[in-house]
């Protein structure tokens, strides 16, 4: 039988004569005639105190049991006289699954730097900070699925291997075939064309939206950008909804509503974890998250955003001009100094956006939108898609891209075209927003970045 989780045990209303809990030892304290073990199983931030009395069957199993060891304990759940805890376990029996020699176990009872913990990513989840981060990550993912399910979206799966470049940026990982482990020769003959890891599931999601109405994909994406920044990783997760019969306003509404729903859910279900991060990682985190959901997001056209930036007379590293793609410093000024709130920028110049975005009537801008949030910058990027065949063909030619490569995408406009819209949400950036963490490497269980491919 599976053990009870500590979060379940701590929610008990009454004492129990027979409990079974498994976990990893955080601390061991010896006293005359008994031993205190602080046990954590990852189900919550809190530990459960386990008391082993001399003479019990469990006492004989204590040899070598220290911080890092994994055990199962069996005994009685009783009220605790200690401060800050309602319950403790009087242990009658203990099974030792694995020891951790203190002279080599890297996680001792002290603060470790994030840089050090990245080198032991396989163990860092056992710390309070990273346990909290990855519980919040899991809750955020579940909240996203629940939100879309309630909204009538279908969860779909799009290819990881692709022959097309959704973004047209060319920063893709090539996939080739090696005929044996010792073969230095590679081949593109498997598919008969070049194959890459996907940068986005958007184009395929559009196809399914044209028959299912509202869909979303939630999966890994890959960018071969040689960017060693706290905001970029080579492998990350994207949430990409697509909606038939939707325009730019619908898209902006969905982006705002989804973001707020996830924040509310995490604040509701993981307040202990958030409080820890508020104290040790990002002071003021709880207040910042509450402020985000307290009032509607600002909406500002690209033209107005550039005007605001020009009027600031700030000495930006990247000078502000119309036609500029907003940089991190511009996003930071808009969200943290000017609006002091999330802002959705819309109607961008077509020259700085992708081919599939719908051209506005002014023929100079497209119906694109970016959701910018304080401390993170761009969280979501999306658009109303170009549903008019002639306009889409013209734009593809204008950018010098291959019409033949997108024959299937163009078919959506030939056969029953419909206005539709969607966006991509960078899931790791959302987790950074929720946790106060400043480096994307610390919200990915096993980060993939330039020059680093451990685990």
From Swiss-Prot:
Belongs to the class-II aminoacyl-tRNA synthetase family. It comes from the Bacteria. GO terms for biological process: asparaginyl-tRNA aminoacylation. GO terms for cellular component: cytoplasm. The keyword Nucleotide-binding applies. It is found in: Cytoplasm. Homodimer. HAMAP family: Asn_tRNA_synth. The keyword Repeat does not apply. Keywords: Aminoacyl-tRNA synthetase, ATP-binding, Cytoplasm, Ligase, Nucleotide-binding, Protein biosynthesis. It catalyses: tRNA(Asn) + L-asparagine + ATP = L-asparaginyl-tRNA(Asn) + AMP + diphosphate + H(+). Its EC number is 6.1.1.22. One of its GO terms (molecular function) is nucleic acid binding. It comes from Lawsonia intracellularis (strain PHE/MN1-00). This is Asparagine--tRNA ligase. SUPFAM superfamilies: Class II aaRS and biotin synthetases, Nucleic acid-binding proteins. InterPro entries: Aa-tRNA-synt_II, aa-tRNA-synth_II, aa-tRNA-synth_II/BPL/LPL, Asn-tRNA-ligase, Asp/Asn-tRNA-synth_IIb, NA-bd_OB-fold, NA-bd_OB_tRNA. The lineage of its organism: Bacteria, Pseudomonadati, Thermodesulfobacteriota, Desulfovibrionia, Desulfovibrionales. NCBIfam families: asnS, PRK03932.1. Pfam families: tRNA-synt_2, tRNA_anti-codon. Its main location: cytoplasm.
